[in-house]
């Protein structure tokens, strides 16, 4: 292990710039939490494991701040009332967009300086959840509730201005009758 980062180039300079920033954030987290030596984590000498959502989410947040793709994902989850708890973000691709959203919330509510404090507290306590609680003064359950409220206040007002699909359209398929989950290449007959 040589404390290196890999930066792939896929042909787009904009994407390349994003990847550089993203990977450098991982290097900074590694330095801050593990003193630049993640070998202790691999060998089992260091017990602290930064949650995937916190690591990937912060890398996304600091490399692109907030973007339309992230906004679209989080808007859909909030409107459909399918927001996961913060610990549940670890188990899906939402570690990136959901984690990015959590960091957006934290920086807006508590300030950007809390980001470094959270990681310092993680290192001090050797526990991610206690690090967040020590820095923010709330546990993950309360942080989850507050984050959900933040997203609902942001996105639910959009629903007021939308028409109900049933008011201007006619349903042409009925899933309860066809027992299918999605329609591919629908055609009128």
Regions picked out by a protein language model, each given a short descriptive name:
Residues 170-189:
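Beta-strand-rich domains and repeat architectures in extracellular enzymes and scaffolds
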Residues 1-4, 8-169:
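Acidic/His/Gly-enriched intrinsically disordered linker/tail segments
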């Amino acid at each position: 292990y040589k404390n290196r980062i890999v930066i792939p180039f896929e042909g787009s300079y904009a994407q390349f710039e994003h990847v550089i920033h993203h990977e450098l954030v991982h290097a900074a987290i590694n330095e801050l939490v593990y003193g630049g030596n993640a070998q202790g984590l691999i060998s089992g000498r260091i017990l602290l494991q930064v949650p995937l959502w916190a690591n990937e989410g912060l890398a996304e947040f600091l490399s692109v701040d907030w973007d339309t793709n992230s906004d679209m994902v989080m808007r859909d989850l909030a409107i459909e009332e399918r927001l996961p708890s913060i610990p549940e973000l670890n188990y899906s691709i939402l570690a990136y967009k959901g984690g990015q959203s959590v960091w957006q919330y934290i920086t807006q509510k508590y300030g950007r300086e809390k980001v470094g404090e959270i990681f310092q507290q993680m290192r001090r306590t050797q526990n991610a959840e206690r690090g967040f609680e020590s820095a923010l003064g709330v546990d993950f359950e309360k942080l989850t509730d507050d984050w959900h409220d933040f997203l609902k206040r942001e996105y639910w007002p959009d629903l007021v201005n939308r028409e109900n699909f049933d008011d201007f359209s006619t349903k042409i398929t009925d899933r309860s009758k066809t027992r299918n989950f999605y329609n591919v290449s629908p055609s009128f007959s």
